């Protein structure tokens, strides 16, 4: 979505001028209306923490469901997976401090120095590791990174089997993509960066299905015969 102050974005949400964009994530008009309070609360939280006169963008990354092929991704097999309309959302704005601050609903604020991309053993298993890992992944692939402030909220519940960590990784990756790379990084690369963050920084071995489904969205088949270059096809 376009960049604007939190107050401007709130007015656009309440006036229904963003409904067509929101339908791409939430499908029906009824579902879209249910999201209004969610996004308004997210922007209110951003204003309270980071100020009212910031240029802010809104972001979303879905959870995923596996239709077929559980664990076949890391066995070089095929999977059928889908993004769902339970998602993680964020309001984010660049800063010039090279510091990333992320306040997620229900959690304390994560603060990560974007100039220190080394693996921190004390962060393993915790969300700052995912933020640092995503930043490191973008750097590894030759893309720009920098500081930003963000508030997030998620309906992809941890432990629900809908890939809450992958949704969060992809959400952070999407923020870095649009805040610092003009949206030029493709969904497959964001998924690979998210997997890198989870494997190397969070300390959890995983295949690529979760991140790929969250990043690409929709219903997709993914052939992992060559795990570094999976073949993705949309299913109508």
Regions found by a protein language model. Give the residues of each.
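Short Gly/aromatic-enriched secondary-structure transition segments
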Residues: 76-83
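Conserved hydrophobic/aromatic beta-strand scaffold that supports enzyme active sites
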Residues: 81, 89-91, 219-221
């Amino acid at each position: 979505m376009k960049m604007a102050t939190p107050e401007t974005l709130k007015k656009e949400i309440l006036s229904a001028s963003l409904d067509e964009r929101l339908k791409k994530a939430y499908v029906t008009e009824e579902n879209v209306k249910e999201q209004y309070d969610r996004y308004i609360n997210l922007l209110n939280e951003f204003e309270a923490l980071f100020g009212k006169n910031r240029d802010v963008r809104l972001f979303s990354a879905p959870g995923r469901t596996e239709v077929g092929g559980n664990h076949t991704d890391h066995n070089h097999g095929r999977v059928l997976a889908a993004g769902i309309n339970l998602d993680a959302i964020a309001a984010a704005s660049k800063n010039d401090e090279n510091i990333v601050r992320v306040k997620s609903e229900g959690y304390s604020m994560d603060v990560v120095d974007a100039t220190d991309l080394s693996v921190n053993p004390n962060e393993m298993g915790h969300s700052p590791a995912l933020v640092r890992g995503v930043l490191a992944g973008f750097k590894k692939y030759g893309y720009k990174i920098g500081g930003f402030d963000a508030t997030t909220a998620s309906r992809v519940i941890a432990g629900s089997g809908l890939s809450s960590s992958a949704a969060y990784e992809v959400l952070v990756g999407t923020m870095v993509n649009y805040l610092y790379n003009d949206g030029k990084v493709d969904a497959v690369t964001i998924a690979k960066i998210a997997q890198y963050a989870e494997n190397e920084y969070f300390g959890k071995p995983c295949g690529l299905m979760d991140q790929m489904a969250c990043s690409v969205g929709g219903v997709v088949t993914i052939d992992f015969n060559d795990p570094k270059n999976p073949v993705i096809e949309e299913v109508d």
